Amino acid sequence: MQEALSILLGDEAKGLSPAVLGRLKAEWAQEYAHWQRRSYRKALCLLVGRRYLYEPPCGEDPRICLLVIIGVTAEGKKELVMVSDGLRESKASWLEILRDLQARGLETAPLLAIGDGAMGFWAALDEAYPETGQQRCWVHKTANILNELPKAQQSKAKAALQEIWMAANRQAAEKALDVFVRNYQAKYPKAVAKLEKDRAELLAFYDFPAEHWRHIRTTNAIESTFATVRHRTTRTKNCVSRSSFLGLGFKMLQQAEKRWIGIYAPEKVLQLFAGVKFIDGIPANLTLPDDQQTAA
């Protein structure tokens, strides 16, 4: 508990009495409950859904995990949208969160959602916001694919996967993906199946501004934040109740939020909301036909 408190209070965390600690935990739990009820009438360009496994407080269901949603506003600012808990890989848990956001004002579907491929988040998103595009995290997908390969093959395969998501345009990415399939299908069909299963969702970023690709190909921008939160909160598992635990996690995420950097070229977000279509990272009206690109 001391480690987590030090992030929030600094040196003042040392030597706090049990009574003061109890009051702080109660205040944070109350602040979290109030935050969860706030109106949220914003337009979101991006929505990042992540679930973080931890050891729940004593007496809680061991399948419980922390569910977090980060958003990118029309101004290009990253902000904390939702913090809750729910069952691992549960569509119902995520759907409850998304329905709650709708009820509090997030009626317009976000333009794109980003996450790994193992969550009930996607099934819930299909029901709550069917218009929202979907982008699978390349870091998580790469790790899952490499797990199906012998260690001796992993370095070469990782480089081949990187050629896909680093391709300058969708056509080149599709070609690189086809090469990977041809090279690994016969010996490692499970690895190839994991890649092809989310083929469209892995390449969705090509329909967004090129300046945003670094933000939307993976969930990396927020991973370090939650690695710290998970580490700190896991070590408090025997010290707090569920409400105190959520309050503590919420306060730590709020603290981290102050250091988040907005996305590059935020003016392109306004273009997206204005209905401008992007092809291979460039506005469609500025994109050359395929034959002219080849000639160039």
Swiss-Prot record:
Required for the transposition of the insertion element. Transmembrane segments: none annotated. NCBIfam families: transpos_IS256. GO terms for biological process: DNA transposition. Pfam families: Transposase_mut. GO terms for molecular function: DNA binding; transposase activity. InterPro entries: Transposase_mutator. It comes from Acidithiobacillus ferrooxidans. This is Transposase for insertion sequence element IST2. Keywords: DNA recombination, DNA-binding, Transposable element, Transposition.
